[in-house]
Amino acid sequence: MNNFLKRLVLFFSFCVINHAEAARPMLTDDARIVDPKSCQLESWVRDSEHVTEYWALPACNVGENLEVTIGGSLESESGQSSFANELYQMKSIIQPIALNQTGFSIVLGNGRDPKRAMNKAIQDWFLNVPMSYPYNDRLVIHTNLGVTHFTDEHKEKMNWGLSSEYNYNERVDLISEVFNQSSNSTFFQFGLRYWLIKNRAQIDTTYMNSFNRFGEDQSFSVGLRLLSLPFLP
């Protein structure tokens, strides 16, 4: 077994949550990344009235302060399945989050939707600045401000988000947010995260809806998060 395969075995055999908390299942990002030379896997299913989405977003901190994410989704609609989204993203911490200190990070990414514009793959570039403020040892507030360049429309649209994480007890986090991702609708989402095995695996579930078209845009999600020990060279 070569070194690369050994690292893969190490990743999937010894997955363990470290001190960094990822944003999933919230759409509002946080000012955190995974530990140096470590990886994470975020996966979830989102079900709405007409479409079911299956997401997987593996990410690795390839150095000391550069998290790279490459992933996407599969959609099932009217009995037909297709690859719906691709995501390529880099994230770096500007100022780490600490008690009484707001954390800042910067995110640069590229999104592709193969179904748009007569099945031509369209690239949408985005820039986002997540900020995280620890209100106390239980509550953290996150804000996002960013912009997306829509290639086929030749214009830019703003993104924003506001979310909260409340540590209810040693196993449960309560989460909520409002956000707008370059659309005409503002959404809200709330749910919880639960440790299946403390410091090893966590599941989450959420409910999402739109203020503009309440009931028509509602969806539910369930997800699984795993993070690895350091194993990259």
Q: Which residues make up each language-model segment?
A:
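Cleavable N-terminal export/targeting peptides
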Residues: 1-27, 231-233
